[in-house]
Amino acid sequence: MSELIVNVINGPNLGRLGRREPAVYGGTTHDELVALIEREAAELGLKAVVRQSDSEAQLLDWIHQAADAAEPVILNAGGLTHTSVALRDACAELSAPLIEVHISNVHAREEFRRHSYLSPIATGVIVGLGIQGYLLALRYLAEHVGT
C-alpha cells in the first residue's frame, strides 16, 4: 500500500511565523514548521505536502485538488477561517478528513476570532496547542485513515 498523502495548508500570514506576534504564535518559523511536519509525517508512514499562501484563490485550488484526489487536509486558514464562505464551500467537497488547526487559542482572543466557517464541516478542530496541533492532526490521520 502506498503512503497516505496529507495536505497541510496554511493560509494568510502564516508564512510570517516566527516574526509575526511571536508571543501569540511562537518563535518557530514556517520553514522550521514545514521540516517538523515532514519529519513527523515520515515517522508515521505518511507523506505531508505542506503549502502556504496569502491568496484565497490559491488555497481554494489546493483544497479542490485534495478533494479530487480524496486526500485528507490539515488546514490552518488563518484569518480566512472567520470570513471565507468560499473556503468553507470548497472544504465541504472533501470526502477525506479535514482537520482545522489554529496555533493560538482563538476562543481566548478577540470576539471575531471565535467564529469559524470551517468548524461545522471539519472532522476535528485543534486550537491553542501551538505547532503541536499539526503533529496531533498527523497522528490522528495516521491512526484513523492510516497507512
Swiss-Prot record:
SUPFAM superfamilies tied to this protein: Type II 3-dehydroquinate dehydratase
Catalytic activity from the UniProt record: 3-dehydroquinate = 3-dehydroshikimate + H2O
The protein's annotated pathway: Metabolic intermediate biosynthesis; chorismate biosynthesis; chorismate from D-erythrose 4-phosphate and phosphoenolpyruvate: step 3/7
Keywords: Amino-acid biosynthesis, Aromatic amino acid biosynthesis, Lyase
Active site: Y25, H102
A GO term from the CC aspect: cytosol
Subunit and interaction comment: Homododecamer.
UniProt family annotation: Belongs to the type-II 3-dehydroquinase family.
Function as written in the Swiss-Prot or TrEMBL entry: Catalyzes a trans-dehydration via an enolate intermediate.
Record protein name field: 3-dehydroquinate dehydratase
Protein source organism: Mycobacterium tuberculosis (strain ATCC 25618 / H37Rv)
